[in-house]
Regions:
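Flavin (primarily FAD) cofactor-binding/catalytic cores of flavoenzymes
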Residues: 1-220
Length: 222
């Protein structure tokens, strides 16, 4: 709770008067240069997977993305009222006698039983398991395929993202051919592109808006 109080206090100071939030704002300012690093393929496939997707991505999300200060204050209130309990790391869940048993190896004395379990985490992008009927039909008919990383030692990694031409955003079919008239942009391409869920920022030539304009121009050219 001390961490939450400090986090909310720093957030309320904003990026103009808060030294911590001002420093973290640099990560937001660096988004476009980082995107260019990804888009131009300046990282090897192994570096892209191990360093960028698995290490930097989670660190960047933790430092520069999060809820507004109001939500942190609300969480503190719920914790203080005993309505919410933050579990120790390494949670494990088992079904026993019609209930869910929650335990963690980091604290052997901790144990909680519950009748209901709600999966509330945001799932990773994974086109093959997506519930979207259009995506499934495109994959089934060969009009689309998932972006695959070619790693060292002949290893491969399925990113789960829909493969697109990074320059035009045109959908790539099973043979890697761009298809005129079919475009994909946004969350389904996370892994080919980076941070596709970020909202446009004011007073900058935002990547999301530039990409939307580029797609429209390509459509008119076709």
């Amino acid at each position: 709770r001390h961490y939450l109080r400090r986090d909310a206090r720093e957030a309320m100071r904003g990026t103009k008067t808060g030294p911590l939030t001002s420093a973290l704002e640099v990560l937001r300012d660096m988004r476009d240069p980082i995107r260019q690093l990804v888009e131009r393929g300046l990282l090897s496939q192994d570096q892209y997977l191990d360093f960028f997707l698995r290490w930097f991505n989670s660190l960047n999300d933790f430092l520069s993305i999060g809820p507004p200060a109001l939500r942190i204050d609300q969480l503190q209130a719920l914790l203080g009222a005993g309505i919410i309990t933050i579990l120790p790391p390494g949670m494990q869940i088992k079904g026993i006698d019609g209930q869910f048993l929650l335990k963690t190896p980091s604290d052997p004395s901790f144990s909680v039983q519950a009748k209901s379990l709600l999966e509330a985490r945001v799932p990773a992008v994974n086109a093959p398991t997506a519930q979207n009927a259009l995506i499934q039909q495109l994959l089934h008919d060969g009009y689309a395929h998932t972006y695959e990383l070619q790693l060292n030692a002949d290893k491969r990694f399925q990113s789960g993202a829909i493969a697109v031409d990074r320059q035009t955003q045109q959908l790539l079919d099973a043979n890697e051919h761009p298809q005129p008239g079919l475009f994909f942009w946004g969350v389904p391409t996370e892994g080919v592109h980076w941070l596709t869920t970020a909202s446009p920022r004011p007073l900058v030539n935002d990547t999301s808006l530039k990409t939307a304009e580029q797609i429209v121009q390509t459509i008119w050219e076709v």
